[in-house]
Amino acid sequence: MIQPQSYLNVADNSGARRLMCIRVLGSSNRKYANIGDMIIAVVKEAVPNMPLKKSEVVRAVIVRTCKGIKRNNGMILRFDDNAAVVVNQEGNPRGTRVFGPVARELRDFNFTKIVSLAPEVL
């Protein structure tokens, strides 16, 4: 579960290294975000000489959470870190590569481009 003030790793090569969630998109009083949800975040740590700079406000899709998600077959999928992929207004990733595994549920939320770039889909 990701809430405002939560820090996330960035799972792509957009230039950001760490993000801090400042808003969970959805209904007006939504408190938590999970895998496949869109958030508004601020770049807290960035790679030098890349398009994204520190203190830039971006949109991101959550691809991994420590809390995990429960599937219909009873399996619970948990990851080692909280991670997100920086996206543009249309939901397409800003980077050209995605690092680490992502959940299969992203395909259900129409983030097929992120799923196709990922090296491993669990």
Swiss-Prot record:
Cellular component, GO annotation: chloroplast; cytosolic large ribosomal subunit
Pfam families membership: Ribosomal_L14
UniProt keyword list: Chloroplast, Plastid, Ribonucleoprotein, Ribosomal protein, RNA-binding, rRNA-binding
UniProt keyword Zinc-finger, yes or no: no
Top-level taxonomic group: Eukaryota
Subcellular location(s) per record: Plastid, Chloroplast
Any GO molecular function: structural constituent of ribosome
Gene3D superfamilies attached to this UniProt entry: Ribosomal protein L14
GO BP terms: translation
Subunit structure: Part of the 50S ribosomal subunit.
Family: Belongs to the universal ribosomal protein uL14 family.
Function, in words: Binds to 23S rRNA.
Protein name (record): Large ribosomal subunit protein uL14c
Species assigned in the record: Staurastrum punctulatum (Green alga)
Recorded name of the encoding gene: rpl14
